[in-house]
Amino acid sequence: MKIVIVEDDPGIRKELKQLLENAFYEAEIIEEFKDTAEQICSMIPAPDLVLLDWNLPGESGFDICTKLKEHSDIPIIFLTSRTDSMDELTGILKGADDYITKPFNPPILLARIGVVLKRTIDKNAEKS
């Protein structure tokens, strides 16, 4: 399963990539934050999930989430330092499938990724 990491902090990007690859996911990093939703939607094969930071240079994670949900049903997990409950509520209402604050606990993050992916697979199986 392919997971896209949209994170501006190089240390966190590296940590996430290593964590995901150790859990046998394919991890792809986006480092250019211009037309990010379009970059993600044009990936072949399409990603199975996006880990999305909220605070990015040039483009907000909130805007990226909104654009992605207009054009795809790729699940999104916000992974952000924004701890305000209104930010979390806004993220979920705009289409994010989960909202995790930094610093994150790696086993909990992997568990929540697994839950979102299972829910998505189950939902897609029902459509078939």
Predicted features along the sequence, with ranges:
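Short alpha-helical interdomain "coupling" segment at the junction between an upstream regulatory sensor module
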Residues: 123-127
